[in-house]
Amino acid sequence: MIFSQGASPLKGDFSKIKFSIASPESILAHSRGEVLKPETINYRTFKPERDGLMCEKIFGPTKDWECYCGKYKRVRYKGIICDRCGVEVTTKSVRRERMGHISLAVPVVHTWFFRSVPSKIGALLDLSTKELERIIYYEVYVVINPGEPGAKQGIKKLDRLTEEQYFQIITEYEDNQDLDDHDSDKFVAKMGGEAIRLLLKSIDLNETAIHLRKVLKESSSEQKRADALKRLKVVEAFRKSYEPQKKTRKKAVGLFPEDELPEPYVFEGNKPEYMVMEVVPVIPPELRPLVPLEGGRFATSDLNDLYRRVIIRNNRLKKLIDIRAPEVILRNEKRMLQEAVDALFDNSRKANAVKTGESNRPLKSLSDALKGKQGRFRQNLLGKRVDYSGRSVIVVGPELKLHECGLPKSMAIELFQPFVIRRLVERGIAKSVKSAKKLIDKKDQVVWDVLEKVIDGRPVLLNRAPTLHRLGIQAFQPVLIEGKAIQIHPLVCTAFNADFDGDQMAVHVPLSQEAQLEAALLMLSSHNLILPQSGKPVTVPSQDMVLGMYYLTKSRPGDPGEGRIFYSDEDVLIAYNEDRIGLHAQIFVHFNGAVDQKFDPLRVLDTIVDPKSEKYTWLKSQLEKKTILLTTVGRVIFNQNVPDSIGFINRVIDKKVAKELIGRLSSDVGNVETAKFLDNIKEVGFHYAMKGGLSVGLSDAIVPDTKVRHIKNAQKDSTKVVKEYNRGTLTDNERYNQIVDVWQKTSNIVAEESYQKLKKDREGFNPLYMMLDSGARGSREQVRQLTGMRGLIARPQKSMSGQPGEIIENPIISNLKEGLTVLEYFISTHGARKGLSDTSLKTADAGYLTRRLHDVAQDVIVTIEDCGTTRGLHVYRNIEEETSGQIKFREKIRGRVAARDIYDTLNNNVIVKAGEIITEELGDLIQETAGVEEAEIRSVLTCESKIGICSKCYGTNLSVHQIVEIGEAVGVIAAQSIGEPGTQLTLRTFHQGGTAQGGISETETKAFYEGQLEFEDLKTVEHSAITEDGVEEIRIIVVQKNGKINIVDPDSGKILKRYVVPHGAHLHCNAKALVKKDQVLFSSEPNSTQIIAELHGRVKFADIEKGVTYKEEVDPQTGFAQHTIINWRSKLRANETREPRVLIIDESGEVRKNYPVPIKSNLYVEDGQKIVPGDIIAKVPRNLDRAGGDITAGLPKVTELFEARIPSDPAIVSEIDGYVSFGSQRRSSKEIKVKNDFGEEKVYYVQVGKHVLANEGDEVKAGDAMTDGAVSPQDILRIQGPNAVQQYLVNEIQKVYQINAGVEINDKHLEVIVRQMLQKVRVEEPGDTELLPGDLIDRSAFVEANNNVAEKVRVTEKGDAPSRIQEGQLYKTRDITKLNRELRKNSKNLVAFEPALQATSHPVLLGITSAALQTESVISAASFQETTKVLTDAAVAGKIDYLAGLKENVIVGKLIPAGTGLKRYRNLTLTGESVETISHDASDDASTQNGI
């Protein structure tokens, strides 16, 4: 690594770091002396040996201001070099920065450049790693110059020779050895590092590059081109390392005389021979310490051992050379030296790594010190230990304010000790620091008074590990408390994910003024009420507080004082305090403000007041005028805490309402008022939870009486299913699915009834029901298990078919109150254990996902206000998604900037203008306006900012509801927002105790709205069938795939809902008919896909042979035979093929229709049978994964999407719009052809047995899946382009988070990550740019490369141009035009030229791991993964890290370029109009006099 000159690298201000291969000169320039001896310290004196690995002369003194021999002591001799021992008198800290060196007897190859993949040395010399290894380890000679003997023998440069061949040539041509080494006729062959060095030195990089480019252009062999490209990449990397230097040299030459250029400008770029070392640097001794242990033993760093081996072998080799030892011995010693240096640099790569004596573990080399979690980057540079910090157990502090935390006095005095000491000395209470310390140790009362003063207004930071998102560290104002535990406010527990079962927290003290200011303004807990991931409140009351508020605001019919009328709130409170009215009594209060209520008071009025009385009439008129309010006493008490601007909240307050209310408050009245409100409702909640005496007893869990009846019915139904199976009308798969259905329905009915029973118990005041209904604790699922029945349980191991989610078909009938039988208990233990083990395994996965996300997005910062793009993202209203509880249209557009005007098409007016922010209110308005079907919004995905992103494309900062500020680290926030719920996603499994909760297979689909029906692409046939009662009925059967039924609003013609009708469904309605809500539209069989006949005719089997392509299973009880298609490939001979299909033929025997039948399908027709439209030909069973709830699908699915992996069994996707036809059948695959109207045809080969979704003649669009399986994101990118794949990834990841965990993450966070995955392009044709085919580069770098050649031309014929103009080279258009003008004037031949060709490329979708490794920053990539590879590549290419991201700045110890650390904010000067003088505080004087 090359640093600017100076005593210590990296001191002072620097803006970039350059990586390059260290030349022998630069190693010597950094060295303070040569290490000659392997010794470290003297065994008697324990002082460092001279010229050894710890030598004071080379590395500096071991004691401050004292030389080795003791002649010079004390600071006054600073800088003097002792004439006796040669040690400079200075501080011992120099032993952390001074380096030494070892001069090697023979050159040694650096293992990084030789063993990296692809090998850098191998690529330059065109040698394989194996051949290189043989040369480097002295096994064969390599020809460096064939000379005259070589020419005669037919030997070329780089040929390998054995020892015999070498000596044969040497003896044959003895005179040859007398020639000078530089003579071209001399035959030279060598081995080892020396040979490699000479070969590398002889390489002309420019010539090699020209030659390789020529091969690339002209060679027809694919292999040759691939090899040339691999080599060219390394050659170009070396050539690039010269480029930045040329520019800096140009600048410098004018400033300094040529021979006095400073070191950075002398650097000429990387020379290939630098990869072979003549000098090995020795790192400072303090970085490889030797530590004395008790008992006179020493602990040493492994590096000392490795250096010792190098020095011993090097010294031995020097001796052997001096005494002219035989070649064999020398060669062996040289090989051992090479191995010793290899081990020093990278010991883990070697198969026979050097191991320690005692524990037999491999020694940690220099590479290991950088790599991995314990390496230098992650252990010391990214995660440092912090002073002024402490940790302790946390307990709840219910009396604290939201911005406060309770800090134990003993901790506070330790943390703030220096400040207390200073204050004690300043005020004359203590004479010196020592006496102040004594006072503190005595715990004098005055110390506590001073401490109170010191901490006043000084926030502290509290952190709970794991810090998954930024709310894991918050600032609080400390309050001194007795005891040893930190107290925290109950409302911040959610943000920290803390509970009080032994959790610990760390305290940090911000020291500088800036740090204190940022902590107080940005990190104070009362300023962090909103979750950055979704914009929803995070400080929401939970558990007791929710229960207390719910109890307080609930009404109870017949409570004392019901129906009384009060003039004001005060009157109500007085009456309640005097015990005249009950807490839950429904009363009337005069009120004129805004009211938030969801019920109609007129409907319940007659239950409170006699309808015949005058009071009723008067109250009714007042309620209609809205001058009086029907509410409860509790709600009046609750509303004392609600700000007036919000109005009167006349609702039962459960968790959901509380969350909504806090959200409204934070956006309407700001954080200060909201924090006050939160503190007040915390008090109220705890108070009334206590007053209500709400606790759970066994009698509160009530089992419904109807449970026994429902279970009997279910047992009857399942017996009926088994009978049908025995009769042969059902397959085993259908039997299983139907039995599971029966029990799932029963389980749900019992659960619902037990819930209703709880609801009615004690007029809704059953504690268990209140806890559940208020959202304080528990779920319906838990009530079902407590009082209903535990239901179906997922099967432990994966089933034979590899389906993880199979269900045991015998349910657990008991519930937890009644108790389980032994067998039931045994079955249910599995789920509980699996939950716990899953949790621990998956937490690590989620953490690793977070780390990768953070690494890929850490440099995404808001850099400019507006990038000026005209592109945007189209967001559509999807009613189906909204009704199924997914994200609403409003959520997708809220907080974004409109890219185009948003119109209401029905009323033809603009709701939002382009460039405006869609606020909360506008979002609600758009959601409710039926005329807005879509909106085009600015998005991170379409942002055209070159560095980072712009604030217009990002939209609002979700945690403050305002447009994002420049400098916001949105990449880190995105990574945290996705990673934090990732762990929650994981921790969900065991809450269900492994019970199966899959969706009940609903066979009937009902209308969601009233409206008129419209059929779209719906092809049907009529079919007569005999019902169970023996009556014939005509059914309408759907025979088209993907047909749709739309419900349309008859007035506006707007589609309200769209249903996709499955193939084989039975229609219950007609086109254009008017339907009511919940009317049945169609019914379908959910457990199988049906193949339905569309024509009259006769069945003919093709390739359906018993024992070959189908098996016959006869049920022993019924005698009924079931025909199932089997996987027949193994039964055939080579080149033999089959394609089982059912043909429908007419009377003449001509084939009318062809139906391929996939493997595992069950046939429902016989060969030769007559068939009518609507008959079932076959059923393909669906494997329903019913076990649902387990996240096993969740986290791996998210990882698969973020890593852009190709699914294990991807669907085959059409690349063009067109019509499907089937081609020929092969042994293991069949052809599907798609042909469009322009005659273009694409052919796809589908594996036999894969279910084909498309039928002959079907129309498909580009991107449609034609077979089952997941669609690969790479296919979407290739066929539909980057926009489609971005949308696909965002939507798919959202689905996993919402469906599996119900977690809400704003789209913009996913967009930030997906944008990073598509930042790179792959060069296809480089044109005349300097790019290489197959290069993976940043999109902006690609555009820049093309812009560089846009103004240039390539000379095809130079004419009479001067010699500086070369054919095939690029020149600026204006220069050549000017030259041609001059040539024309002089009647000379003009220069012929053509425009320079631009490069072409295609976008590449990278997974987050590879995207993080491909980042522009070397330091960031190196600290992520594959450290040695990243550093090797960077050094070869002479890369410069411009320190643009966050991570690299943390590593080099600079302020991060985000937030207040942005360059533009660094050197602000404040100018003020007037200066205000602040009077001296008299109270401070008084306190001084009192001795504080």
Curated annotation (Swiss-Prot):
GO terms for molecular function: DNA binding; DNA-directed RNA polymerase activity; magnesium ion binding; zinc ion binding. The gene is rpoC. The keyword Hydrolase does not apply. GO terms for biological process: DNA-templated transcription. Binds 1 Mg(2+) ion per subunit. Binds 2 Zn(2+) ions per subunit. Keywords: DNA-directed RNA polymerase, Magnesium, Metal-binding, Nucleotidyltransferase, Transcription, Transferase, Zinc. The keyword Cytoplasm does not apply. This is DNA-directed RNA polymerase subunit beta'. Belongs to the RNA polymerase beta' chain family. NCBIfam families: rpoC_TIGR (TIGR02386). GO terms for cellular component: DNA-directed RNA polymerase complex. Transmembrane segments: none annotated. DNA-dependent RNA polymerase catalyzes the transcription of DNA into RNA using the four ribonucleoside triphosphates as substrates. It is an enzyme of class 2 (transferase). PANTHER family: DNA-DIRECTED RNA POLYMERASE (PTHR19376), DNA-DIRECTED RNA POLYMERASE SUBUNIT BETA (PTHR19376:SF54).
